[in-house]
From Swiss-Prot:
This is Small ribosomal subunit protein uS12. Part of the 30S ribosomal subunit. Contacts proteins S8 and S17. May interact with IF1 in the 30S initiation complex. GO terms for biological process: translation. One of its GO terms (molecular function) is rRNA binding. The keyword tRNA-binding applies. Keywords: Ribonucleoprotein, Ribosomal protein, RNA-binding, rRNA-binding, tRNA-binding. The gene is rpsL. GO terms for cellular component: ribosome; small ribosomal subunit. Belongs to the universal ribosomal protein uS12 family. Gene3D superfamilies: Nucleic acid-binding proteins. It comes from the Bacteria. Disulfide bonds: none annotated. The lineage of its organism: Bacteria, Pseudomonadati, Pseudomonadota, Gammaproteobacteria, Enterobacterales. Pfam families: Ribosom_S12_S23. HAMAP family: Ribosomal_uS12_B.
Amino acid sequence: MATINQLVRKPRSMKVAKSNVPALEACPQKRGVCTRVYTTTPKKPNSALRKVCRVRLTNGFEVTSYIGGEGHNLQEHSVILIRGGRVKDLPGVRYHTVRGALDCSGVKDRKQSRSKYGVKKPKA
């Protein structure tokens, strides 16, 4: 235990919090260009073909982003918006693609949770 005199000379240092999404650089979203669109398999015990893409961001970072929802129109050179948020069963995937923004279309025929998938309110 430090004495009061030691603490006066050199106060206790604060722990520096590490960001979970370093490529965003404290921004809510970032724009980038798809360099590769592919599917990958999750870790045990799950089984699927998850849609992901490699993205070269405007700040020079190259990250992997998950494409949520059923079906997408992304291909190489598509310009997309990414946000933070990891995918628990895909190692190394720490970002999500924002559906319905820039070149990424919203999910077709989506009726519920539409705001998360970039879908306008259907005509009644």
